[in-house]
Amino acid sequence: DLMQFETLIMKIAGRSGVWIYGSYGCYCG
């Protein structure tokens, strides 16, 4: 499920601190 995948990305992002999600062009620090 795409929603679960996005949640996984967010969890990884929270740990790594910085990430870029091309599909939405989202930059989160």
Swiss-Prot record:
Annotated source species: Ovophis monticola
Record function comment: Snake venom phospholipase A2 (PLA2) that inhibits the ADP- and collagen-induced human platelet aggregation. Exhibits strong hydrolytic activities and prefers the anionic micelles (dPPC with deoxycholate) to the zwitterionic micelles (dPPC with Triton X-100). PLA2 catalyzes the calcium-dependent hydrolysis of the 2-acyl groups in 3-sn-phosphoglycerides.
The protein's name: Acidic phospholipase A2 Omo-E6
Cofactor note: Binds 1 Ca(2+) ion.
UniProt note on tissues of expression: Expressed by the venom gland.
Cofactor(s) recorded in Swiss-Prot or TrEMBL: Ca(2+)
Lineage, top ranks: Eukaryota, Metazoa, Chordata, Craniata, Vertebrata
InterPro entries for this protein: PLipase_A2, PLipase_A2_dom_sf
Family recorded in the similarity comment: Belongs to the phospholipase A2 family. Group II subfamily.
Assigned keywords, A-Z: Calcium, Disulfide bond, Hemostasis impairing toxin, Hydrolase, Lipid degradation, Lipid metabolism, Metal-binding, Platelet aggregation inhibiting toxin, Secreted, Toxin
Binding-site list for Ca(2+): Y27, G29
Subcellular location: Secreted
Reaction catalyzed: a 1,2-diacyl-sn-glycero-3-phosphocholine + H2O = a 1-acyl-sn-glycero-3-phosphocholine + a fatty acid + H(+)
This protein's GO CC annotations: extracellular region; host extracellular space
Top-level taxon of the source organism: Eukaryota
GO biological process: arachidonate secretion; lipid catabolic process; phospholipid metabolic process
EC number: 3.1.1.4
Molecular function GO labels: calcium ion binding; phospholipase A2 activity; toxin activity
